[in-house]
């Protein structure tokens, strides 16, 4: 898959590649939502330090350069609301996401995933997958709403966040075949 743009602007939100300057705001936002995020995200379950934040931003920069992952801050009115990432997989991509508590229920993730799914297909991905713990109903509602199909369950990586069961549900959406060229 080709490299996506660094910024996407939509009505009501912006997706922007993470920058080192985002560190202080990201740190404050994650720490303000630790209970909410830590239930499902192992990286937030034991607290989130300035070093954790700096390491995340370093890793996102390296992964972007290698094409392994393209991570974006979700911004609403200029403020960080959460994150969405597009991870390269053989023949397709996986999309992961999270939001700060105060931004849940606004349709931001559904709209961000819609945008990035369309972009992934435009850039050559054959499929998009979304994985979530089988108990995380909110995360599962996104691919269900967007027409993805459950293709399997699989063991989650260890260690697990406190609310996780250890079983991930995997959803997939295939790129629609291109229409036949005119005159064929």
Where do the language-model regions lie?
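Generic recognition of well-ordered alpha-helical segments
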Residues: 55-59, 115-118
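Generic, well-ordered alpha-helical segments
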Residues: 18, 29, 45-52, 66
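A short helix-loop-beta-strand connector motif used in the catalytic cores of GNAT acetyltransferases and
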Residues: 44-47, 58-73
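Short, intrinsically disordered/low-complexity patches at protein termini
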Residues: 48-51, 60-62, 105, 162-164
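Acyl-donor (CoA/ACP) binding surface of acyl/acetyltransferases
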Residues: 1-25, 29-36, 71-184
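Conserved GNAT-fold acetyl-CoA-binding loop/helix
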Residues: 35-58
């Amino acid at each position: 898959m080709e490299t996506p743009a660094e910024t996407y602007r939509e009505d009501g939100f912006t997706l922007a590649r993470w920058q080192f300057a985002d560190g202080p705001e990201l740190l404050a936002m994650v720490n303000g939502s630790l209970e909410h995020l830590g239930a499902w995200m192992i990286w937030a379950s034991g607290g989130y330090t300035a070093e954790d934040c700096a390491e995340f931003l370093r890793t996102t920069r390296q992964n972007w350069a290698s094409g392994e992952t393209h991570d974006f801050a979700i911004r609403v009115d200029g403020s960080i609301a959460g994150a969405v990432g597009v991870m390269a997989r053989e023949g397709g991509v996986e999309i992961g996401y999270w939001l700060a508590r105060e931004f849940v229920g606004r349709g931001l993730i559904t709209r961000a995933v819609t945008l990035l799914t369309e972009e992934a297909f435009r850039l050559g991905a054959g499929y998009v997958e979304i994985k979530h713990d089988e108990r995380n109903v909110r995360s599962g509602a996104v691919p269900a709403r967007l027409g993805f199909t459950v293709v399997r369950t699989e063991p989650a990586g260890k260690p697990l966040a406190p609310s996780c069961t250890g079983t991930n549900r995997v959803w997939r959406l295939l790129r629609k075949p291109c229409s036949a060229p005119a005159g064929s």
